[in-house]
């Protein structure tokens, strides 16, 4: 089976997929024109929705499209074909998102950016906390 990887970090995904499933034919590149040429020969696509949306706009359609993002918004444009199976990354970003939100909330509560600006401007900051 031929698998196209449309991802900015395509080399990492290619290496991991070839190691996990050596019987697959994996196609990947950082060049968008070459990616477009490869797309028509690959029934399975793995990658970023924004990059795969460009391939769909060019008239290519996979049998199965696996998003590496949880969100699929770029693939929902009215002009794009939806004649394929679409799956997305789910259940793997929970802890990372929780850490991001907690860090952001702490930074907001402690006014980290305002304190940084005061330091850059060499102003004494009398904020409590």
Residues covered by each model-derived region:
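An N-terminal-biased, well-structured beta-alpha scaffold segment characteristic
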Residues: 1-86
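Phosphate-binding beta-alpha-beta segment of Rossmann-like dinucleotide-binding domains, i.e.
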Residues: 82-129
């Amino acid at each position: 089976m031929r698998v196209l990887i449309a991802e900015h970090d395509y080399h990492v995904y290619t290496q991991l997929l070839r190691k996990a499933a050596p019987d697959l034919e994996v196609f990947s590149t950082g060049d968008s024109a070459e990616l477009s040429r490869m797309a028509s020969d690959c029934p399975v696509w793995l990658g970023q929705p924004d990059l795969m949306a460009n391939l769909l706009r060019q008239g290519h359609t996979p049998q199965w499209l696996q998003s590496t993002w949880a969100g699929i918004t770029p693939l929902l444009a009215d002009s794009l074909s939806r004649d394929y199976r679409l799956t997305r990354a789910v259940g793997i970003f929970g802890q990372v998102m929780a850490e991001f939100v907690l860090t952001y909330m702490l930074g907001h509560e402690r006014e980290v950016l305002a304190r940084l600006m005061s330091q850059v401007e060499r102003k004494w900051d009398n904020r409590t906390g």
